[in-house]
Amino acid sequence: MDDATLARLHSVYDGLSLVQRHHLKVIVESRPEVLSVTLCGFLVDLGLARVDGESFTATDDGRYVASLF
């Protein structure tokens, strides 16, 4: 990971509330193959993903997760 990307991630993380940080920790600790609908819902609530038909995709600014499904 290059320095610019790391700096951007730190900036994003610093802007998260404590609840958002907790949810992000849960997401990071989960294996992608066991992501539940509830957890995917948290990603949407946090603005980390958006619903696109039957799948979840990264937000348009590309700051976060890529496609989940």
PLM feature segments, named:
Residues C40-G41:
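Short, hydrophobic-biased segments on the C-terminal half of alpha helices
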Residues G53-F69:
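Accessory beta->alpha helical hairpin/"wing" motif in late/C-terminal subdomains of nucleic-acid enzymes
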Residues D2-V37:
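Short amphipathic alpha-helical interface segments
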Residues V44-E54:
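A short, conserved structural fragment
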Residues M1-D2, D60:
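Intrinsic-disorder/low-complexity regions
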